[in-house]
Amino acid sequence: PSILSADFCNLERDLKAIANADLVHVDVMDHHFVPNLTLGEPIVGRICQVTDLPVDVHLMIEDPDRWAPEYAKLGAASISFHMGATHAPVRLARQLREMGCKACFAVRPAEPVEPIFDILDEFDMVLIMTVEPGFGGQKFLNNQMAKVRRLRDEITRRGLKTRIQVDGGVSPKTAHIVAEAGADVLVAGSAVYGAENPAQAIDDIRTKAEAAFKA
């Protein structure tokens, strides 16, 4: 789940509430690359220390070439960055992988996915945004599923192991749509932390996605 929808004054409590999840998704925003400001290295470092879950960091910041390795040093298991922000995406991806961190590429709704096909084998995962980046709780953009399908077809055609992550508007109502399109990593924020029982919401999303995988 995305902690963007968690209570930042009770973050350790809210991390424990999602102990049944597969990962913790942390959105780092600098108020320059996107119009919001969230958290930075000190808090991400503490999150890595207090949770047993893999920490998946999404950098919505300028100059990830400089900052991404710092988050890898803090213990991030995977780091996503944007093409429009990096000067050398392949070099950065290789650097992160050499540090034992998975390299991930993030694609915003208005951006096509095809330009990254040539360097797809350099990345462990591609993050397809299904809301405009910057704020949680937005409406799911169903038109992005065509992008997910094209990406899945390319990954399958080339026999790659690159995973597809979808973030934005994911809920028990949309999980099957995302999974059917070909995504295998689902990030939910408000659907989890806005639920009366976050752990149950995670199970519901997982069940819906797994059913779609098997269909």
Task: Give the ranges of each region predicted by the language model.
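Generic enzyme active-site microenvironment
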Residues: 25, 165-166
